[in-house]
Regions:
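RNase H-like DDE/DDD metal-dependent nuclease/strand-transfer catalytic core used by mobile genetic elements
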Residues: 4-15, 19-28, 37, 41-127
Length: 127
């Protein structure tokens, strides 16, 4: 795990990852979630069927323009566990928004995925 400094306010440290879900209409779909480590606020971007480099970059770009993400204009770190081979391109997307991308699968699993699992369980129950 890389050295990650825990945030002192929201939007300083955001995890961004995907989970796969089975749908009736489209089969397996990749759902993308952003997770603010400080506030534990979860945002989603549109899903996609194929997890291609173009789709990963499109999802990050969508996040940069998401109304809930653009509330604060502060430097941030986007922690990802997909798209490692796209690091340069992803940083080009986030740099205009004062961001930088790092990759840390262990951090995503520890910080983000437990809350995503709870959310998906609640959604599955219709709560």
């Amino acid at each position: 795990m890389s050295e990650i400094t825990y945030p002192s306010q929201s939007r300083e440290l955001v995890c961004f990852s995907t989970i796969q879900v089975q749908t009736v209409q489209d089969g397996i779909v990749n759902l993308f979630f952003a997770y603010d480590v400080f506030s534990k606020f979860i945002m989603s971007t549109p899903g996609c069927i194929n997890l291609t480099p173009a789709n990963i970059m499109k999802q990050v770009d969508f996040l940069m323009h998401h109304k809930d993400f653009t509330i604060k204009d502060i430097p941030f770190t986007l922690v990802m566990d997909i798209g490692q081979d796209l690091e340069e391109e992803l940083n080009l997307i986030v740099e205009p928004f004062k961001g930088k991308v790092i990759f840390d699968t262990d951090f995503i699993e520890k910080e983000m995925m437990p809350d995503i699992a709870v959310m998906m369980k609640l959604v599955g129950k219709g709560s």
